């Protein structure tokens, strides 16, 4: 059974638009990992227009008699940018990436020419700046200088939706010395907080969206945000639309059927992968360990939140399994194992050979090593197909580096060795395991990665900045617990380092660490956004998404150890079906009356 969507022809740009008809399966869940079955096809031969592509995606044609004449219109950048923002927030931008790239290239040319359609409207200017900077175009924040101080801002533009766009623009600050974005962020965040506190945002959906942005902007997980956007979606909050009819294409019941089917497809895949993770966990006998954390559900959620495309199943499973293994072994080093047993695991990984049962020394060591050994070997086999070369030496090396950092930390706190913050971070950035999790998952993105790329200084710097962010965020939230456990932590190291100088308070130490987090986050963003790179942008994006994961996990607690918000988000992302949108509901009611 299939659905056919018929949409009106809507003028949008100067590109060719042709009407087509396309069919989509109706079934709620499609349990498959086949790329050809999962990926919704998007081949165009006649049109490169953004809305034309959306129309062809949803409405396609089955015979030439339905073809409509070519229509040419002037480019409308404000509407195009709103369209892109909607597609990204609704999680379907991946189907229109070439069209989005074309729109942003045109936007950049007009930005350089200071086109009035962009610069005359504050919201459009802020949105264009954000999109262009994220895409890697050289755009200066000087163009936002007129809005850097609230006292100089015309009260007429200080409506909530405009300030939200200025706030989002301020979040792409990549230089420490950028005082314009710093000031912009200061007043827009204050303004929006005041609006929430005074309850002056009458639109409930907009109120919730502002609340969501302010809560933890850099910890927003893409797929969680998609689910929220689908629940809250309302085109009415865009103030710069010149022709409302142009948005009928993304605000009608047919489009929401498409969105819901796309989300349900992804959700079904996540459910299947959770079952696979649970079977793997039991097959590896990790469920028999009577210590530490079982993070199967947590890891499944984090993988789903970071790698949203249905076809990236191998990347999600590799990422999730690596998180589980890291957590189990980390807990063994910290809590359950003796120093000798911990050393034994490192020796076994260096040797990388299976042993007779009696040679492992303990049941726990045997289970942990064999689980790691079998899983990494499986990764290597799958990656060989995708990469066209053996990556097992790389994967083993990553684990040796990680376990060596575990050993250094173990030696430091058991020997009560005094460290400076720099000495601590020299190994602690490795022990947060971002490097092994990220580089393992990168093997399964469908991008060929050479040894030179993975051993480059750029790769090392990406890993280091990412790891500094997540390591220090973790340390701030786990400081009290780890102090009681007598384990090493950046906060305790900083406090101890000033013991013989001017003593600093815990608040001052935490503030200093948060400054380091921000510095490394901006450096990471700059590396991800830059155009010149040995890594494709698809790979660099993963580093940024994993840093957002750190902000998500350690915003106000330790969601990895005691997941609360995470479990709520997992329900909506993995388990709860997407409800009918009011537009669809109205259509169903109307159909029932006929």
Swiss-Prot record:
Motif (DDXXD motif): 330-334
GO molecular function annotations of the record: Labd-13(16),14-diene-9-ol synthase activity; magnesium ion binding; syn-isopimara-7,15-diene synthase activity; terpene synthase activity
Signal sequence segment: none
Enzyme Commission (EC) number: 4.2.3.-
GO cellular component: a single term: chloroplast
Pathway assignment: Secondary metabolite biosynthesis; terpenoid biosynthesis
Residues that hold Mg(2+) 3 according to the record: 474, 477, 482
Residues annotated to bind Mg(2+) 1: 330, 334
The protein's name in its UniProt record: Class I diterpene synthase TPS6, chloroplastic
């Amino acid at each position: 059974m299939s659905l056919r969507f018929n949409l009106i022809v809507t003028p949008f740009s100067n590109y060719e638009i042709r009407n087509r008809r396309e069919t989509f399966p109706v079934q709620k869940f499609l349990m498959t990992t086949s790329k050809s079955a999962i990926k919704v096809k998007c081949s165009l031969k006649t049109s490169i227009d953004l809305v034309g592509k959306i129309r062809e995606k949803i409405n396609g044609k089955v015979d030439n008699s339905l073809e409509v004449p070519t229509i040419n219109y002037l480019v409308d950048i404000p509407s195009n940018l709103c369209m892109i923002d909607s597609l990204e927030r609704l999680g379907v931008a991946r189907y229109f990436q070439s069209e989005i790239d074309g729109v942003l290239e045109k936007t950049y040319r007009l930005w350089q020419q200071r086109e009035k359609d962009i610069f005359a409207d504050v919201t459009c200017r802020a949105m264009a700046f954000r999109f262009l900077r994220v895409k890697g175009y050289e755009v200066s924040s000087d163009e936002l200088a007129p809005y850097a101080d609230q006292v100089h801002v015309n009260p007429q533009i200080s409506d909530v939706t405009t300030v939200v766009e200025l706030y989002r623009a301020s979040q792409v600050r990549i230089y420490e010395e950028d005082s314009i974005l710093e000031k912009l962020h200061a007043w827009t965040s204050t303004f929006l907080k005041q609006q929430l506190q005074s309850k002056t945002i009458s639109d409930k959906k907009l109120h919730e969206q502002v609340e969501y942005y302010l809560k933890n902007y850099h910890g927003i997980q893409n797929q969680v945000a998609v689910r929220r956007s689908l629940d809250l979606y309302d085109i009415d909050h865009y103030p710069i639309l010149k022709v409302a009819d142009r948005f009928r294409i993304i605000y009608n019941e047919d489009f929401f059927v498409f969105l819901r089917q796309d989300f349900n497809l992804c959700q079904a895949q996540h459910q299947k992968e959770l079952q696979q993770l649970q079977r793997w966990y039991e097959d590896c006998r990790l469920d028999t360990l009577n210590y530490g954390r079982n993070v199967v559900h947590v890891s499944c959620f984090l993988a789903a939140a970071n790698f949203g495309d249905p076809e990236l199943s191998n990347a999600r499973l590799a990422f999730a399994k690596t998180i589980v293994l890291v957590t189990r072994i980390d807990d063994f080093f910290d809590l359950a194992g003796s120093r000798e047993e911990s050393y034994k695991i490192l020796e076994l990984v260096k040797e990388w050979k299976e042993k007779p049962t009696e040679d492992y020394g303990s049941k726990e060591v045997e289970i942990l090593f064999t689980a790691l050994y079998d899983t990494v070997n499986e990764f290597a086999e799958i990656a060989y197909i995708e990469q066209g070369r053996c990556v097992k030496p790389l994967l083993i090396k990553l684990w040796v580096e990680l376990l060596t950092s575990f050993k250094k930390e173990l030696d430091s706190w058991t020997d009560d060795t005094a460290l400076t913050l720099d000495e601590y971070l020299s190994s602690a950035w490795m022990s947060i395991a971002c490097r092994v999790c990220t580089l393992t998952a990168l093997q399964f993105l469908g991008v060929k990665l050479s040894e030179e790329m993975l051993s480059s200084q750029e790769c090392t710097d990406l890993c280091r900045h990412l790891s500094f962010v997540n390591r220090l965020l973790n340390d701030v939230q786990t400081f009290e617990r780890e102090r009681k456990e007598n384990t090493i932590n950046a906060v305790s190291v900083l406090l101890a380092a000033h013991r013989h100088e001017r003593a600093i308070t815990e608040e001052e130490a935490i503030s200093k660490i948060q400054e380091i987090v921000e510095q490394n986050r901006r450096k990471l963003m700059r590396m991800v956004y830059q155009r010149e790179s040995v890594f494709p942008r698809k790979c660099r994006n993963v580093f940024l998404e994993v840093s957002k994961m750190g902000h998500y996990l350690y915003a106000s607690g330790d969601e990895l150890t005691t997941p609360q918000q995470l479990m709520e988000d997992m329900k909506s992302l993995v388990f709860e079906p997407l409800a009918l949108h009011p537009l669809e509901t109205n259509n169903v009611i109307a159909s029932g009356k006929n």
